[in-house]
């Protein structure tokens, strides 16, 4: 998993509440188990009209938001099914963090497990962030738990264990591999 310490990127506001995992990545695209390739179909039913013709009315298709890597959204983001593919699609598209009012518990944990930082903020802060220019960079400082903007700095909470995992780029396999020598020694001893 890629380390997440201090990240700078531009943002795109998709301020709907209750964006569910089927809207993030529709079920017809869940046939693969590799984490790559899902970004093309992110928000498929909103982004495209037919045959991948871009919907000019969907904000991610606006040229000024094409390189956004921070998604700002409303409450209850990632509700619906438990598909991990939703986090994969957001990451594969290029998002590194989501700033929303709240998340479904399963999506929140799936995002963290895949190195995608879900940040909770109150509606007042979300509304302020949507006023930023599409070209203005936002800094996410995970060690200090801050969102840094020209409008001010906004603190966020994160479980210290997840914070440590993200800062060190450790998923569950990475954590296990830290004990590789001890595991090998145990296996040698108990053959």
From Swiss-Prot:
Class of enzymatic activity (EC top level): lyase
UniProt keyword Lyase, yes or no: yes
InterPro entries reported for this sequence: 3-IsopropMal_deHydase_ssu, Aconitase/3IPM_dehydase_swvl, AconitaseA/IPMdHydase_ssu_swvl, IPMI_Swivel, LeuD
GO cellular component: 3-isopropylmalate dehydratase complex
SUPFAM superfamilies according to UniProt: LeuD/IlvD-like
Short name of one Pfam family: Aconitase_C
Biological or metabolic pathway of the protein: Amino-acid biosynthesis; L-leucine biosynthesis; L-leucine from 3-methyl-2-oxobutanoate: step 2/4
EC numbers, comma separated: 4.2.1.33
Keyword terms, alphabetized: Amino-acid biosynthesis, Branched-chain amino acid biosynthesis, Leucine biosynthesis, Lyase
The organism's place on the tree of life at top rank: Bacteria
BP GO annotations: L-leucine biosynthetic process
Family statement drawn from the similarity comment of this UniProt entry: Belongs to the LeuD family. LeuD type 1 subfamily.
PANTHER family cross-referenced by the UniProt entry: 3-ISOPROPYLMALATE DEHYDRATASE SMALL SUBUNIT (PTHR43345:SF5), 3-ISOPROPYLMALATE DEHYDRATASE SMALL SUBUNIT 2-RELATED-RELATED (PTHR43345)
Role, per record: Catalyzes the isomerization between 2-isopropylmalate and 3-isopropylmalate, via the formation of 2-isopropylmaleate.
Protein name, entry field: 3-isopropylmalate dehydratase small subunit
Species the sequence originates in: Lactococcus lactis subsp. lactis (strain IL1403) (Streptococcus lactis)
Native organism taxonomy: Bacteria, Bacillati, Bacillota, Bacilli, Lactobacillales
Gene field: leuD
């Amino acid at each position: 998993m890629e380390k997440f310490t201090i990240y700078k990127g531009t943002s795109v506001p998709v301020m709907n509440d209750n964006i569910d995992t089927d809207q993030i990545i529709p079920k017809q695209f869940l046939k693969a188990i590799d984490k790559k390739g899902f970004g093309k179909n992110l928000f498929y039913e909103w982004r495209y009209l037919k045959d991948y013709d871009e919907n000019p009315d969907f904000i991610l298709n606006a040229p000024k938001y094409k390189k956004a890597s921070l998604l700002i959204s409303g409450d209850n983001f990632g509700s619906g099914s438990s598909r991990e593919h939703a986090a994969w699609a957001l990451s594969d598209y290029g998002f590194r963090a989501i700033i929303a009012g709240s998340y479904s518990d399963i999506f929140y944990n799936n995002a963290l497990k895949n190195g995608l930082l879900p940040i909770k903020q109150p509606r007042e802060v979300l509304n302020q962030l949507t006023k930023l220019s599409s070209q203005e960079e936002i800094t996410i400082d995970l060690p200090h738990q801050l969102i840094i903007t020209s409008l001010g700095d906004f603190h966020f909470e994160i479980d210290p264990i997840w914070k440590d995992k993200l800062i060190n780029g450790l998923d569950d396999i990475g954590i296990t591999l830290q004990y590789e020598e001890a595991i090998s020694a145990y296996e040698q001893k108990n053959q």
